[in-house]
């Protein structure tokens, strides 16, 4: 394949969009596979493996000159550490919520983070909420209520388990919003790019996660055997590694998508991606398919599309040039992700 063909492929909008969706779905499903394994209770270990694999993967990609990011600097690491600590809180609460809730319900409730972030931007960054954005928020809340109702009606789990799942989901929405808003401010001060952010986030989270797994999780032989039974050990470890690589894929394809299309297109893709993600959860994990669950998924999907359109209109009013692909410097995917809330995951 000649360089001209490779160049055409790299600039095609279809491949990065599909790649982003596949990476996002793959990460969520592999996480759910591990967390739904019978008796699995070592969430911090899972997150440690993911972060370690992620750092190793982007290190290899940097050596191959596929990507580039800053070399480690102790001063920058000290300045960035609080963000990584918030990241640990966010990904741990996300893992607990995903452990107790079905993939469709988890996906729908993640929309609520967008609302918290939007009003956080109003308070701290001078943002504003338009009527159409407010309407999309109403749809998000409605879809979450319908999803919770359908989940409670059809769930075979004990009510205590469901309550735990929704409690972790609320905590995840709050920690997710805190992480995104704090990271936005730090990015402005450090001028970090996508892979700078990814490198420091994952590298600095590793020692925190190692301490948490060593001191809060049961490392007895019996519990290790329960978490990694001989007949499923390889599959669980492979899923852990794949989820770590998928997080790299999400970051890379996010930047790629923004570069060859526009930040608006990226926002829309994030909204549209919720539908196949929810459907994948129904297909692969036998989540109950009821009128309520399907209605909630459709409402969540529509709310995401309306939100993306609202953000597109705001961007158009702010700077007409930015709605045209390749007519401006690419927006940092991490910054855009902050506006639109995705575990990348």
From Swiss-Prot:
One of its GO terms (molecular function) is antiporter activity. It is a multi-pass membrane protein. The keyword Transmembrane helix applies. GO terms for biological process: GDP-mannose transmembrane transport. It is found in: Golgi apparatus membrane; Cytoplasmic vesicle membrane; Endoplasmic reticulum membrane. Residues 30-40, 102-104, 151-161, 216-233, 286-288 are lumenal. The chain crosses the membrane at residues 9-29, 41-61, 79-101, 105-127, 132-150, 162-182, 195-215, 234-254, 265-285, 289-309. Residues 329-345 have a biased composition (Polar residues). It comes from the Eukaryota. Homooligomer. Involved in the import of GDP-mannose from the cytoplasm into the Golgi lumen. This is GDP-mannose transporter. It comes from Schizosaccharomyces pombe (strain 972 / ATCC 24843).
């Amino acid at each position: 394949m000649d360089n001209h063909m490779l160049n055409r492929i790299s600039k095609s909008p279809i491949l990065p969009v599909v790649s982003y969706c596949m990476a996002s779905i793959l990460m969520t499903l592999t996480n759910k596979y591990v967390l739904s394994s019978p008796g699995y209770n070592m969430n911090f270990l899972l997150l440690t493996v993911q972060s370690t694999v992620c750092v190793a993967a982007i290190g290899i990609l940097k050596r191959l000159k596929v990507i580039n990011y800053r070399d480690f600097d102790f001063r920058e690491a000290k300045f960035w550490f609080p963000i990584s600590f918030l990241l640990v809180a966010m990904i741990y609460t996300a893992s607990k919520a995903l452990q107790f809730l079905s993939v469709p319900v988890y996906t729908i409730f993640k929309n609520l983070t967008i609302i918290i972030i939007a009003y956080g931007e109003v308070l701290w960054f001078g943002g504003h909420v338009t009527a159409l954005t407010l309407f999309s928020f109403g749809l998000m809340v409605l879809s979450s209520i319908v999803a919770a109702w359908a989940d409670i009606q059809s769930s075979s789990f004990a009510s205590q388990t469901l309550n735990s799942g929704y409690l972790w989901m609320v905590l995840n929405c709050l920690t997710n919003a805190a992480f995104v808003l704090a990271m936005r401010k730090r990015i402005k001060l450090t001028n970090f790019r996508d892979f700078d952010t990814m490198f420091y986030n994952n590298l600095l989270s590793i020692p925190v996660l190692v301490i948490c797994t060593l001191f809060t999780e049961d490392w007895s032989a019996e519990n290790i055997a329960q978490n990694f039974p001989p007949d499923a050990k390889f599959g669980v470890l492979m899923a852990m590694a794949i989820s770590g690589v998928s997080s790299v894929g999400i970051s890379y394809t996010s930047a790629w998508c923004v570069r060859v299309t526009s930040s608006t297109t990226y926002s829309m893709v994030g909204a549209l991606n919720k539908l196949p993600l929810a459907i994948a959860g129904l297909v692969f994990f036998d989540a109950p398919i009821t009128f309520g669950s399907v209605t909630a998924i459709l409402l969540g999907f529509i709310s995401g599309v309306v939100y993306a359109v609202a953000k597109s209109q705001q961007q158009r009013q702010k700077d007409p040039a930015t709605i045209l692909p390749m007519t401006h410097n690419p927006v940092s995917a991490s910054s855009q992700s902050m506006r639109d809330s995705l575990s990348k995951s």
